[in-house]
Amino acid sequence: LYDDTYYGKYVITTSHLTIIGVTKAKITYDARNGMIVRKEDGGDGVKTYGTTGSASLTVKPSATYLRLENLIIENSYHRVPGNKGNQNVAFKTEACFGTYTNIDFISEQDTLYIDASDNYFDNCYIEGDVDFIFGSGDAIINNSTIKMLQILDSNAYLCAPDTYASSKYGFIFANTRVISSGNNKKYLGRAWYPGGAKEMVIPRVLFYNVDFPQDVDLRVITMHEGDPLNFSYYIVNSLQAGKVINNIEAEKLNSYFDYYKAQYLSLIHI
């Protein structure tokens, strides 16, 4: 893909497709959840995009084994005080077995929406503020940089997993650096229990060999008062201000990784 800016909403439906930017081609759009759908996107003057519909690039379930490299995928909408429905997704995948290398995912709220299993992100840059890595899928995010922003006066939450009980192990962040800007309160994440989920949700996330800044509260909390507490988050062999952080036993860690060993662990050198 030639280095240029490609403005619009794009959808991938083809399996075993490879798209590689020459250096860093940009795909960008500026829709948000509560925005009326534009005419060019099939709008009727009433319907809104919704969270899923706000994505600049969407990968449909049929597009398995997708490979993307050397791209910037951006939602350029900027949140405005008082607006309802500020979720602005840059990228959503609904397909399994995707590999994403050297991709910049840029947005604010709900940047990266992972809603399928067995996706692998390597050497990526991801930025946002509220729940900006989220979804029900299983994914490894390896050797990447994640930036937590301050947009308006809201707290920042790095991730919001809503892992299905039948899924493998939710999100794994490995060999990754977290950086931050602003003075807002920042949390590792919050467990998401969406209304209308197709099955029981047990949010799961693991941070392995991750370097955290001092201003991040190393907890995953519930999203709403009264939400269940049946979520799990683990921090292993990680650092915050030079202090080693571990909250899981080695035996449990080995069990946690069992599913990924054949497909992924040789790639991420754990």
PLM ranges: what are they?
Residues 2-267:
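Sequence-level preference for short, compositionally simple segments enriched
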